[in-house]
């Protein structure tokens, strides 16, 4: 009896496994993976986390930006340089480029234009580690930072800057940056 039961179990197991083995394989398209980067001939490489970053300036009351020259609290952000070779260069500085809000405020980034709901009379100002507002022409570099072998953190700050009585709305801005080694 035990042998008969064991034989039935073995036959059942084989039947189930052969059914699973004969099941159709299905393949579906999954998507696309984009790989982005750059090979550079420079003293350092910009850290991947610094290349496309977002600085959250948060919500600021329009009453705080009620007059020209008023600013919000500054928010810190960093540009990190990795894999530095101090025999190639010993210092690095950064320049930002973007659209200035107007010709009399060349250190204030214009806000992105959205269809409706943008704040007015306000822009974004970028400060270097000495607290100096940086021109947004892509040619005015921050104070130089002395490089170490690895890693190097170059600190900056960003804040809202009122050019008049700010009105409420979305207040986003973009700038690009480049690094100069010496």
From Swiss-Prot:
Keyword set, alphabetical order: Disulfide bond, Fimbrium, Signal
Tagged with keyword Signal: yes
Pfam families: Fimbrial
Gene3D superfamilies documented for this protein: Fimbrial-type adhesion domain
Position of the signal peptide: 1-23
UniProt cross-references to NCBIfam families, sorted A to Z: PRK15194.1
Record's protein name: Fimbrial subunit type 1
């Amino acid at each position: 009896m035990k042998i008969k039961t064991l034989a039935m179990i073995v036959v059942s197991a084989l039947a189930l496994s052969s059914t699973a083995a004969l099941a159709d394989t299905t393949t579906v398209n999954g998507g696309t993976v984009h790989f982005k980067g750059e090979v550079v001939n420079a003293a350092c490489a910009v850290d991947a986390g610094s290349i496309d970053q977002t600085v959250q300036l948060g919500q600021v009351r329009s009453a705080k930006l009620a007059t020209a020259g008023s600013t919000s609290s500054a928010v810190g952000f960093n540009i990190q340089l990795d894999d530095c070779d101090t025999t190639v260069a010993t210092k690095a500085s950064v320049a930002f480029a973007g659209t200035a809000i107007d010709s009399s405020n060349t250190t204030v980034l214009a806000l992105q234009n959205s269809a409706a709901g943008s704040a007015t009379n306000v822009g974004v100002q970028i400060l270097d580690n000495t607290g100096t507002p940086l021109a947004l022409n892509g040619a005015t570099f921050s104070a130089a930072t002395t490089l170490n072998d690895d890693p190097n953190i170059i600190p900056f700050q960003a804040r809202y800057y009122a050019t008049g009585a700010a009105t409420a709305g979305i207040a986003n801005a973009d700038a690009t940056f480049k690094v100069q080694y010496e």
